[in-house]
Curated annotation (Swiss-Prot):
CDD domains: SHMT. Belongs to the SHMT family. Its EC number is 2.1.2.7. This is 2-methylserine hydroxymethyltransferase. The record marks T234 as: Plays an important role in substrate specificity. It is found in: Cytoplasm.
Amino acid sequence: MTEQTKAYFNTPVHERDPLVAQALDNERKRQQDQIELIASENIVSRAVLDALGHEMTNKTLEGYPGNRFHGGGQFVDVVEQAAIDRAKELFGCAYANVQPHSGTQANLAVFFLLLKPGDKVLSLDLAAGGHLSHGMKGNLSGRWFESHNYNVDPETEVIDYDEMERIAEEVRPTLLITGGSAYPRELDFERMGKIAKKVGAWFLVDMAHIAGLVAGGAHPSPFPHADIVTCTTTKTLRGPRGGLILTNNEAWFKKLQSAVFPGVQGSLHSNVLAAKAVCLGEALRPDFKVYAAQVKANARVLAETLIARGVRIVSGGTDTHIVLVDLSSKGLNGKQAEDLLARANITANKNPIPNDSPRPAEWVGMRLGVSAATTRGMKEDEFRTLGTVIADLIEAEAAGNADGVVEGAKAKVATLTAAFPVYAH
């Protein structure tokens, strides 16, 4: 072996690429020093990180366990089959495809399976908490299919199931979709399943945000009401970036396999499959149910703390990990609030709320999520503190004197992050 070859296999990133290494170090420090309240984020376990960084990443494969298009895949077969078996056990379904590279890829595969160009899709309005991959303009799903939306009740800000049924009867969609990225309330899968059957539509549940809550028994399961279910393995499931497709429909399963590969994807990500298997195994452990229950409890406390301080919460509360804040009465927009919290080392994101402006710069919502901080070990007391800190910041910004509050807020956040470390080295 030449010296160059030895160096290739043994030189760590800090020596090979100092620029990237510095960014990695900075990101590690950021995750330790900031409290992550972006609802789509979480913190994976050391075991998941180990799988992601394993040499299995070198293996290229297409196809499925026992039926590959490349040799040498016997050990990837083991981890993929483990992921399949664990997904079926965890979510109580008969069939699972664990190969989608993302939740959006999973949704595209379902569209590829069930729809023809021009077919009608009915999904939750984006400003009410829906998702781009459900037929929204600007996404591939909205270019090839005729997209329609249902919405939330303007008073309760909860999905208006009567309106959904009326629109479904009028539109007669081929596919009815529920789920999204910023809907904080429990979803009535049974009611929506009945609506879909009434109008002859397939019923897709995208539970990307709530998959971990479903797995942990903290939210009702979409089965047996859904025809097909997609989700990510990130977010509340605490796994790597990737997607799953689940169903009980035996007749669809072979077609579903082909819809993923070769329909919308080529070779799989072998190391990510291993990490998915690990995270699904973790979610089958009894302590995951404790985690899921704590997520709901923490979100409820955060919402209640903010409400008590005069901060309006969309729909008046939460049943999930998401707390959606309406800043309009404070004279602030979402971007201002996002930047304000960042100054105190709290990470959140601007977000539309029901009937918000279509222009992101004018959104008056801010989305908060408790999953990552709950993974760190924070409980109700810590979220009361966080809610108080956030309310203090919002009030001060609205009054034009945030500078006098930021340093105190930052100190309280530093106390919390020191008490709940991430990946201690």
